[in-house]
Regions:
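Soluble acyl-CoA-dependent acyltransferase catalytic core bearing the H(X)4D motif
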Residues: 1-275, 279-310, 314-328
């Protein structure tokens, strides 16, 4: 599930007060169990593959007919859209040579985690006074912290390649009513060095807007279906070519309770998606909780990275940032 769907599913487990909600619907009885053998699984897989093949065939024929009709009635605009989509697919599916960071260069299979929190009003205020969004302030904070971390290591990284989830909720063809994942991942270089806070926020805003407008971003599902044709080493190289994965998810603005106990924090600890580091933020009850997941081979000094990220958020928001070990 994507971040917003995860929050929605989590809300089903919690109450808005210490006492149970008497009006809450009673869960349905579990379905009766059925014995399932190898033959049943094989038939189910075969039926699913046949349905998928039929859907692809129908979509292909429909698309070809629409294109042929458009070529006759609106030749220039039809071919213009086709060319725009093809070039967009090339940009979105391009495989970079490697990460841009000269420090976060290793990749492994073990991870460590860190966390801290920031007053949400401070982040929202920093964005609002510039006419920008909370996500712009979040991205600028990450950039400031990553710049400080690289300078700690005696290097200046002008840009870092970031993975940024682009929400497709509310778009034409929105799948959120049928699927728990309605995002596509944009991957692009983001400036981190030599810019002021205002410039970093403006750059983040423009970059995310630019990639959200890419036609291929909305083709994530069909592109994923044909990804099995791509050699595994190429897919692995593409995944490891990013330095940082970021994610910002709005959570409930009021306190939640579980079995009468108040939830005091909501730290997101998320997979790196091949990058060296994942930095995610979830807002909850007036605070912004930041979780940091790091690849052990890429980052051997997580405590230093967390301190530099805390400094980055403090610089952008002008507010005191919570300690790194508040709930340790």
């Amino acid at each position: 599930a994507d971040g917003q769907a995860t929050v929605a599913m989590g809300l089903a487990l919690f109450e808005f007060g210490p006492e149970p909600d008497p009006g809450e619907a009673t869960p349905p009885d579990p379905p009766d169990a059925e014995d399932v053998g190898r033959r049943d699984v094989t038939y189910a897989n075969l039926a699913d593959s046949l349905r998928f093949g039929a859907d692809v065939a129908v979509s292909t024929v429909r698309g070809a007919l629409d294109f042929a009709r458009g070529t006759i009635t609106e030749t220039r605009s039809t071919w213009g859209r086709a060319l725009s989509t093809l070039t967009s697919i090339g940009r979105v599916a391009a495989v970079p040579e490697g990460p841009l960071s000269p420090v976060l260069i290793g990749r492994g299979t073990t991870y460590r985690f860190g966390a801290f929190d920031v007053p949400f009003e401070a982040i929202r205020g920093a964005a609002k006074e510039r006419g920008l969004s909370v996500n712009d302030a979040f991205m600028a904070s990450v950039a400031t912290g990553m710049d400080a971390y690289h300078r700690r290591h005696g290097v200046v990284a002008e840009e870092l390649r970031v993975n940024v989830p682009i929400s497709l909720r509310g778009d034409a063809g929105d799948r959120s009513g049928r699927a728990s994942n309605s995002v596509s991942i944009a991957r692009f270089p983001m400036p981190v060095a030599g810019l002021s806070t205002d410039e970093l926020m403006a750059q983040a805003h423009d970059l995310v807007a630019k990639w959200k407008a890419e036609p291929a971003i909305r083709l994530a599902d069909p592109l994923a279906e044909v990804s099995w044709l791509v050699p595994v080493p190429m897919l692995a190289q593409a995944a490891r070519a990013s330095d940082v994965t970021t994610s910002n998810v709005p959570g409930p603005p009021v306190p939640l309770y579980l079995a009468g106990a108040r939830m005091v924090a909501a730290y997101p600890l998320v997979a790196t998606i091949g990058a060296a580091v994942n930095i995610s933020m979830v807002t909850y009850d007036g605070s912004a909780f930041v979780g940091v997941s790091s690849d052990d081979r890429a980052c051997t000094d997580l405590d230093d990275l967390v301190e530099d990220l805390r400094s980055g958020f403090a610089t952008v928001t002008g507010a005191a940032v919570g300690p790194a070990d508040r709930f340790a």
